[in-house]
C-alpha cells in the first residue's frame, strides 16, 4: 500500500463522518489563513516515515477542530472533537488487514485564535505496513 492509498483511505474516513464537514491532507495553517474551511474540520499530514528490515511506518498528525465562541465553549468543543477523533481512530484500527496501529495514540488538546477561534485535538497515529525491501523490485 502506498502513501497515496493511505491518504485516500483516511480522507474517505473523514469525509464519511457525519460530524466532519471539511477534510484536507496537507498544511493546516495555509488553509486556515485562506478562510476556506467549513467547520468542524479534520486536517492531517505526514510527520515521519521510517523503514525497517520488513516494515515501513508512517506517522500522521490528525487535527480535529471546530470554531468556538470566544472562551465560552472551549471545553464543549474539545469534548466533541475528542469523540470525533475516537471515531476516526476506530475506523483506522478496523483496517487491520492492511496495517497495524499501536495500542496507544497520544492526543494533545489545542486552542487557536488566528484566523478563527478554534479548539480541538491533535492525534499522532503510526501505521505499520509490511515492506519487502527487495532490490529486485527496483525499476531498471
Language model: regions and residue ranges:
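Charged, amphipathic alpha-helical segments and their flanking helix caps
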Residues: 1-26, 43-140
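Short acidic low-complexity segments
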Residues: 25-35
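Low-complexity, acidic Ser/Thr/Pro/Gly-rich terminal tails and inter-domain linkers that flank the onset
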Residues: 34-45
